[in-house]
């Protein structure tokens, strides 16, 4: 049985923090699921951390569906939430509904996530009205990074802070079951969390959100080029993997791998007969 919306709402009511991580493949989903993560986000961040794009803007529905299916297959208990890519819900509520439906029918997701507040409330309502759960996302919205002039903290002025509060209320009214609050002052995130009855999931939004989400590649230390301020590295997989690969290369070069332990052998009788056959052909 997977985590339900009701369970997430109960966690907020009971002041139990919600832990969420991204996953993009089968083995990672298995690990997260066994570790007890209640919710897994198949984020469009895969464009940057898996596919090597400069931003999430280039990610397509096909990209997302490919990875979503793997994560669903690799998990049994976690709610799997699929990120709706850039320009897959912006044109109309009908477009949003059709693409959200693909994630549910083809990908096996339990919910979808989309970026925006007041400006996407009509899309959220249309999707929810047809029975598809929606998670909102406000603050720093990566798909709008060009309009926002880069990855910058949002809501730092009175006007901007009030606009984000309005966005959160609009998403709740439209039927969203939770909202991601990204890269905003902790005080503002706390106010938004108190202002809505649905769970808030923070990423760079302080400790007072109802839960937290991180990009799994960041928190596991897969990359050394850039580590977001809001990320805590719980492991150094980049170093561990690099050391392992270097060891493999060295052992192969020296003829130390594989050994008899990693090899398969013929029955002695078969081997002798094979040698006779080969020698008779020469």
UniProtKB/Swiss-Prot annotation:
GO biological process: pantothenate biosynthetic process
Signal peptide: none
Keyword annotations: Cytoplasm, Magnesium, Metal-binding, Pantothenate biosynthesis, Transferase
Reaction it catalyzes: 3-methyl-2-oxobutanoate + (6R)-5,10-methylene-5,6,7,8-tetrahydrofolate + H2O = 2-dehydropantoate + (6S)-5,6,7,8-tetrahydrofolate
Residues engaged in binding 3-methyl-2-oxobutanoate: 44-45, 83, 113
Cytoplasm among keywords: yes
The keyword Magnesium is annotated on this UniProt entry: yes
Subunit structure: Homodecamer; pentamer of dimers.
Family: Belongs to the PanB family.
Name under which the protein is recorded: 3-methyl-2-oxobutanoate hydroxymethyltransferase
Gene: panB
